[in-house]
Design a protein with these regions (language model features):
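ATP-binding N-terminal substructure of ATP-dependent carboxylate-amine bond-forming enzymes
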Residues: 1-94
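Active-site nucleotide/adenylate-binding loops and adjacent lid/helix of ATP-dependent enzymes
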Residues: 4-5, 99-183, 211, 235-251
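Short, charged, surface-exposed secondary-structure boundary motifs
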Residues: 38-41, 98-104, 217-219, 359
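Generic C-terminus detector
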Residues: 50, 367-371, 376-421
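Short, conserved charged micro-motifs
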Residues: 53, 161-164, 339-342, 389-396
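Internal nucleotide-binding/catalytic subdomain
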Residues: 156-293
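Active-site "cap" helix and flanking loop/linker of ATP-utilizing ligase/carboxylase catalytic domains
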Residues: 246-269, 285-357, 370
Length: 421
């Protein structure tokens, strides 16, 4: 099969890496890709905003399945367009993607289908939102309604935080039109996990879970990011909790989509808070998480392309997913200044030495090849993944690999998976 992966992150690198291992894979393309992906796939660069460009490429290269990585292309209806032209796509329709692209749609869906989520109110008016925060108990959570690259959530410990959050989102338009509407919800106590399941027209299939570190700095300090690291498994997640997630959240979500005549084909990411009252849905994402994807795919034993092929043909029920029993830790190396302003084009050296450490696989994100060197070209730059018998050993291997890398322009968290080791 000929496969096209759309995207340029470490998530897409890990997807290409996984698909490449499949006996079913004849040729793999990635648009636009990065300096790491181009070593295992044919990378092309053309205007993805024009859907016809994607269609023409698919026809020219006889693409069997398109795998869409980033959420913005799902929001723009790339999946719908290609399917209407008889191209198979792994990734939900524009309508189904509203589970991520509109927090308001997602919260209403959860409420309609009696799936546990935090109590909430939504506002289009800055004045009404300001009046509301004067009457609530803190902490609270303020969320931009639309897509904000994983950074549109603000946890407010007091009224000053909330006023600043409202000003940034609704007045200063920090997230553009994504902040035209906001959600204000109660703060839930507990711990977060990212849970993943494949959905097709007829059934769903559990992939697994990972724990994500969203804050920029150690001890969960600093601003929210797209994710600075992840790990699996967690000593806090028992079989009982997993079953509760499947029965009270995943299945009702599948049933709700079916009831509302929304066909969902692809991976669905459940951002959950595990509280003393059980799991609550914080958010849905309609694609693989990053860095969770890198972590999960290191642990996946089943052929990913077999799963994707079955998924796009509504035959998930034919698949049995097998995961390894080892532990995986993923540490993200980001450009200094991320998630704010950062410099590009700093040279990264000694990656090949880091890759030699036992259990290590390095996935590229914001990297480019320049004058036969690897240089930084984005906020999150590398995902160092490590697989071992325990979290403790996997952590040790990951940080040993990072020490081998020579990059003065980057930073990373030193506590990924620490609480679980």
């Amino acid at each position: 099969m000929n496969i096209l992966v759309i995207g340029s992150g470490a998530r897409e690198h890990s997807i290409c890496w996984s698909i490449k291992k499949s006996k079913k894979c004849k040729k793999i393309f990635c648009v636009p890709g990065n300096a790491g992906i181009e070593k295992i796939a044919v990378c092309k660069n053309f205007d993805l905003q024009n859907k016809r460009n994607i269609l023409n490429f698919c026809k020219k290269e006889k693409i069997d399945i398109v795998v869409i990585g980033p959420e913005q292309f799902l929001e723009e209806g790339v999946s719908d367009y290609l399917i209407s032209k008889n191209i198979s796509v792994f990734g939900p329709s524009k309508k189904a993607s509203q589970l991520e692209t509109s927090k308001s749609f997602a919260k209403s869906f959860l409420k309609r289908n009696n799936i546990k989520t935090a109590k909430f109110c939504e506002f289009k008016s800055y004045e009404l939102a300001t009046n509301y925060i004067n009457s609530v108990n803190f902490p609270i959570v303020i969320k931009a309604d639309g897509l904000a690259a994983g950074k549109g959530v603000i946890i407010c410990k007091n009224i000053e935080d909330a006023r600043l959050g409202l000003t940034n989102i609704m007045k200063k338009k920090k997230f553009g039109k994504a902040g035209n509407k906001i959600i204000i919800e109660e703060y839930l106590e507990g711990y977060e996990i990212s849970f993943f399941a494949f959905f097709d027209k007829n059934s769903f299939l559990k992939l697994g879970y990972a724990l994500d570190h969203k804050r920029a700095f150690d001890k969960d300090e600093g601003p929210n990011t797209g994710g600075m690291g992840s790990f699996l498994p967690s000593k806090n997640i028992s079989k009982r909790i997993e079953n509760e997630i499947l029965q009270k959240i995943v299945k009702p979500t599948f049933d709700g989509l079916k009831k509302e005549n929304i066909v969902y084909r692809g991976i669905l990411f459940f951002g959950l808070m595990i509280t003393k009252n059980g799991p609550f849905v914080i958010e849905y994402n309609v694609r693989f998480g990053d860095p969770e994807c890198q972590t999960l795919l290191r642990n996946l034993k089943t052929d990913l392309l077999e799963i994707i092929d079955s998924n796009v043909n509504d035959k998930l029920s034919d698949i049995n997913i097998r995961n390894g029993k080892q532990s995986v830790v993923c540490v993200v190396l980001a450009s200094k200044g991320y998630p704010g302003k950062f410099k590009k084009n700093s040279v990264i050296k000694n990656l090949s030495n880091a890759q030699l450490i036992k259990g290590i696989e390095i996935f590229h994100a914001g990297t480019s090849a320049k004058n036969q060197s690897i240089v930084s070209s984005g906020g999150r730059v590398l995902s160092i993944t490590s697989k071992a018998r325990t979290i403790k050993i996997a952590r040790m291997q990951a940080y040993k690999a990072i020490k081998k890398i020579n990059w003065s322009g980057g930073f990373f968290r030193k506590d990924i998976g620490l609480k679980n080791s």
